């Protein structure tokens, strides 16, 4: 199963980009033996529309256009469900074992996700009730993806 992060906005060179790259490279190395591949990031341009609803609609169309057919679509959203790291790993396992061709993790723009994207999601996921900058959320997501591969592999990285 291909693992993909689809994000509105681009990470500039710096500590956050390096951290995301490091976690995804680690996930890629460990994921091969688990039947997981890719661990790629697609960065979509932020909309320049004036109204928030127009920005969400434009960004939503770009997100939907980037989704692989048949993917398990999991979006980060503050109103989403909180999962333990073990439950997150189990979600990845279930998608893989269920024959899903891809797991697509979505991070929307500053205004959030359009209703069209929300309707396409199989799961809305939250990393708690706090608000985080998008670049930090991307690093947190990359770490959880890596942690999921270590949990599935029985690696000692995860010691909960």
Curated annotation (Swiss-Prot):
Gene behind this protein: rlmH
Functional note: Specifically methylates the pseudouridine at position 1915 (m3Psi1915) in 23S rRNA.
Species for this entry: Azorhizobium caulinodans (strain ATCC 43989 / DSM 5975 / JCM 20966 / LMG 6465 / NBRC 14845 / NCIMB 13405 / ORS 571)
Major location (coarse): cytoplasm
GO cellular component assignments: cytoplasm
Keywords noted in UniProt: Cytoplasm, Methyltransferase, rRNA processing, S-adenosyl-L-methionine, Transferase
Protein name: Ribosomal RNA large subunit methyltransferase H
Top-rank taxon: Bacteria
Binding annotation for S-adenosyl-L-methionine: 76, 108
Catalytic activity: pseudouridine(1915) in 23S rRNA + S-adenosyl-L-methionine = N(3)-methylpseudouridine(1915) in 23S rRNA + S-adenosyl-L-homocysteine + H(+)
Family matches, as HAMAP family: 23SrRNA_methyltr_H
EC number(s) reported in the record: 2.1.1.177
Enzyme class: transferase
Family the entry assigns: Belongs to the RNA methyltransferase RlmH family.
Molecular-function GO terms, alphabetical: rRNA (pseudouridine-N3-)-methyltransferase activity
Subunit structure: Homodimer.
SUPFAM superfamilies hit by this protein: alpha/beta knot
InterPro entries noted in UniProt: Alpha/beta_knot_MTases, RlmH-like, tRNA_m1G_MTases_N
A Pfam family this chain is assigned to: SPOUT_MTase
Subcellular location: Cytoplasm
């Amino acid at each position: 199963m291909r693992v993909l992060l689809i994000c509105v906005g681009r990470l500039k060179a710096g500590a956050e980009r390096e951290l995301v790259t490091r976690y995804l490279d680690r996930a890629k190395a460990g994921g091969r033996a688990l039947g997981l591949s890719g661990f790629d990031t697609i960065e979509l341009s932020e909309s320049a529309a004036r109204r928030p609803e127009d920005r969400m609609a434009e960004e939503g169309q770009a997100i939907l256009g980037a989704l692989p057919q048949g993917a398990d679509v999991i979006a980060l959203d503050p109103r989403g469900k909180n999962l333990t790291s073990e439950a997150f790993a189990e979600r990845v396992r279930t998608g893989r074992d269920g024959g899903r061709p891809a797991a697509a993790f979505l991070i929307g723009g500053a205004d959030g996700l359009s209703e069209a994207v929300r309707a396409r999601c199989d799961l809305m996921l939250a990393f708690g009730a706090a608000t985080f900058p998008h670049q930090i959320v991307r690093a947190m997501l990359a770490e959880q993806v890596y942690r999921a591969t270590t949990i599935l592999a029985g690696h000692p990285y995860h010691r909960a």
